[in-house]
Amino acid sequence: MSELNYEHVFNVLVDKTAEYVTSNNLKAMVLGISGGIDSTVVAAICHEVSNKTDIPLIGRSLPIKNKEDEFSVSELVGEAFCDEFKVFNLSNSYKASLFDLCADAGLIKDCKGYDWYWVSDLEELTGRTPIANGNLQARCRMKHLYDIASIRKGLVMSTDNQTEYQLGFWTIHGDVGDFDPIQDLWKTEVYGLANYLRDRYKSKALEALHNDYKETCDKYRAMSYAVYSSCKLIPTDGLGISNSDLEQIGAKSYDEVDDILSRYIPFKEYRQKHGEPLHPHDEMAVLLGGQIQLFALDGHLARGEIHHHI
């Protein structure tokens, strides 16, 4: 995959996002911030859009059983890029949804109320997989973001990249918002853009320091450090399903995944364009192997979402 001009990419993404929000007369951009690289890059894009349009970026960190390092980085990102940022714990919302599921299925027979149960008890009672429970967490977060957007007359920003889309590595009604600035970028390109932004903010901080603009210097230092901290995190879905995204996919690196997908997709599109029958298992077997093949077949080729239908 060829190296992109990330300065140009960033400017194009900012312009397209600004055009969308202004042409639709939206009053706010609402973004869920996990601390991961995707939401961090989208936050940086929306921050620039906000500077150009005066449309505020409203960020929320919505922890549910999150790891401490993810939570701390989400705060760095939110405080660096958002016009309004808040941490709001949705553990009670998740627990209430589990309780309602159990009650609806007739699994709660002792007339005990919501407060009598631990989350782990309710998860066990449903008999659902960790993936299914992870999807419920994602949907709790998305519902909250859409409620905020409704009140503020805004839209919810998506944070899915092309790699996740092609693999089906997303949750229906849990990940996809109204507008996605990075949907055409592979995961490796998201990292490339993040590295460009980190260096860009660092350079601006040094320039401000040289000119004795301390407040401006501190602002850009915070932005650079937020992006740096996000890049250092091991990518996870934030749902507690596995230790990392790559572990779920069955790959050693995103370079490997993006290389496979970028070779497979033109092959698939050529067959479809020329009206030839598509034999997905045969074609994928040519290009993939092991767990990555199974993951891609179950997600991308099934036209579903890997988290949803398992």
Regions found by a protein language model. Name each.
Residues 1-31, 41, 45-48, 53-58, ...:
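ATP/NTP-dependent adenylation/nucleotidyl-transfer catalytic domains that generate, transfer
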Residues 36:
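Conserved G/P- and acidic residue-centered "switch" motifs that form tight phosphate/ATP-binding loops
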